[in-house]
Regions:
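Alpha-helical transmembrane segments and immediately membrane-proximal extracytoplasmic
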Residues: 1-448, 455
């Protein structure tokens, strides 16, 4: 391995002898973007292969008993993979990236270039109610960190490549390059200079281009706003109300996640954690099938105005046309999603909080719209409130209003909702910040055993 590294380094020096440092960083940003795009593609292929093979044959008009079993299998497989093959903690991907930047000279173990893909896809494919973004971000960051290590870059440039990898991976999964850049600047807090932003832009654009080449041009959460979904001035009070509700849901999201994590930490046996987590998750998914996996199908149904699809594979399928049942189902699913997510991670699954925050936000926005339409006979767009709610809860949970605004703007193929996005995201951020000034990532950083030993 040492000889191989020396050979790579000599070839790198020979090829870049006539290039300046900034040119070298731009070249390496392209390399990181390509690798991050490929890693994201492999993750999605593995995830959708597992998920499709397990549940595509389920009848839509009834619940299936395998919903009780699949999540526990996924968690135990991920736990065994981590314990006996990886032998390192690969959960809480974004938190680990922040920790590596602050305390490990931006060094991330090489195995994270692939282990997060396997662990995350296994957990989510079998029904773990977590998001793929954290494993993907950790994978991209690991690629950037290890490219920097192989090139023998200093701490500053290695950190820049780490951030390029993280942003590129996020840009690739959503096909949203601006979101990848803003995510790094806002959450990873990379210094804003021309020397740092340009490689970051290059990596994000390269990874997004790879995603277009491998998966087509449609975003993972593609939605096109119709004329009836357009923002109107009379809706401003409703978006203010939505911002307050999203702020409260953000606080519920973070506090419940921490409480569930503390509960599982008191369980002394990993076997018992798996048993409890698998049982809780299986029961919740059996009753509320939209909780299965990352939940993209759930809020895609809401974004396309087809709330009845949430009842597919459900015990309540025959009630899907009753308005008040739909509203209660959406609200209950919204609250139980947080418990399902926290139980998955705490029991040993590998996944993140990014997609769950979008899920909870989508269901929060849809709940407000459905309630307004049902009780006041208003013609409120469920689609626009679903999208804006996603930005609201994400803004509060991650303390990242800009990332949430640009993500939803890119996903909706335009900026027609920019004003309500700004209103709701900022109010949600303010409400949640008043209740808890820390983001979910810094909260997890504070509560990790490793960080407590550093204090």
């Amino acid at each position: 391995m040492q000889l191989r590294t020396e050979h790579i380094y000599r070839e790198f020096l020979r090829l870049t002898r006539r290039l300046s440092n900034s040119q070298i960083m731009m070249l390496l940003a392209v390399v990181v973007g390509i690798l991050a795009g490929l890693g994201t593609y492999l993750f999605e292929i593995l995830l959708h292969g597992i998920k499709s093979g397990l549940i595509r044959w389920f009848p839509v008009d009834s619940a299936h008993v395998l919903f009780l079993i699949y999540p526990a299998i996924g968690i135990i497989l991920a736990t065994l993979f981590v314990k006996y093959i990886v032998r390192d903690n690969i959960s809480e991907g974004v938190t680990r990236v922040l920790y590596a930047m602050s305390s490990r000279n931006s060094r991330i173990p090489g195995h994270n270039c692939w282990t997060s893909i396997v662990g995350g896809a296994t957990t989510i494919g079998f029904g773990g109610s977590v998001g793929p973004e954290a494993p993907i971000v950790l994978t991209g960051a690991a690629i950037g960190s290890n490219v920097g290590r192989l090139a023998r870059l200093n701490y500053k440039h290695t950190t820049l490549l780490l951030c390029c990898g993280a942003g590129a991976a996020l840009a690739a999964i959503f096909k949203a390059p601006i979101t990848g850049v803003v995510f790094v600047l806002e959450i990873l807090m990379l210094d804003i200079t021309a020397g740092s932003v340009i490689p970051l832009l290059i990596a994000s654009i390269t990874a997004t281009t790879m995603a277009f080449m491998l998966r087509g041009f449609d975003p993972i959460l593609a939605v096109t706003l119709q004329p009836q979904d357009a923002f109107e001035l009379w809706q401003i009070p409703l978006f203010i109300l939505l911002g307050v509700c999203c702020g409260l849901m953000s606080w519920y999201f973070t506090s419940t996640n921490l409480r569930v994590g503390n509960f599982f930490r008191k369980i002394d046996s990993q076997y018992k954690k798996w048993l409890v987590g698998g049982a809780v998750l299986g029961i919740l998914i059996f009753i509320f099938p939209p909780l299965y996996g990352e939940g993209y199908e759930g809020f895609m149904s809401l974004m396309h105005g087809r709330a009845q699809e949430l009842f597919d594979n459900s015990l309540f399928y025959r009630f899907r046309e009753i308005d008040w049942v739909v509203i209660l189902f959406v609200i209950a699913t919204m609250f139980f999603k947080v418990i399902a997510m926290a139980s998955t991670n705490a029991a040993g699954g590998v996944g993140g909080t990014f997609a769950p925050s979008l899920f909870v936000g989508a269901f929060t926005g849809a709940s407000i719209a459905l309630l307004c339409n049902a009780f006041f006979d208003w013609d409120v767009s469920v689609v626009s409130f679903t999208l804006v709610g996603m930005a609201g809860v994400m803004s509060g949970v991650m303390k990242a209003p800009l990332t949430s605004i640009f993500l939803i703007a890119e996903l909706s193929n335009g900026y027609g909702l920019f004003i309500p996005l700004m209103i709701t995201a900022c109010i949600s951020f303010a409400v949640d910040y008043y209740l808890d000034p820390d983001s979910i990532y810094t909260c997890l950083l504070y509560t990790s055993d490793r960080c407590r030993r550093l204090v």
